[in-house]
Amino acid sequence: MEFLTEKMKQFDRAQLRAAVFDLDGTLLDTVRDLGTAANVTLAHFGFPQHPLEAYQGFIGNGLLMLYRRAAPAGTDEATVEALRDYGRDYYREHCTGLTQVYDGVPELLHGLAARGIMLGMVTNKTEATARRVMAHYFPEVPFRFIWGNNGVRPLKPAPESGKLMLCE
């Protein structure tokens, strides 16, 4: 994080006007909350659970993919979708229990904001969950945009999601 802090000092306001961040694995370590939600979900459906460390390799490409990876081999798509739906609902209510802010992130965000740089965050989490997480971990950071899955905007990694944010 020291490297980023030093780089940040090199930018003046004319050079950098906005900074857009991903959430999971960038601003926050969410593996333990996501893994716990997945394990609760798997147990609810009678499937075996995984060590939380295993979820590091399951996360990425959205919740449906997480549950495809976590479910036993051969699990049908309808069941995977049911796992995703149950897990999403559970996670929405338990998304701030074990998540941790990465070292240096608050200082970086406050430093950028102090320089007048507009801050944004884009995630594939539902918009309601994204806003809840951001309000919990970064209540003092003036994010101009907190964009999650609202059912309308394209999801990451579609380049349109970033382009839409830039247009705002």
Regions found by a protein language model. Name each.
Residues 116-120:
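Short active-site oxyanion
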Residues 3-4, 12-107, 115, 128, ...:
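N-terminal helical cap/lid subdomain that shapes the substrate entry/recognition surface
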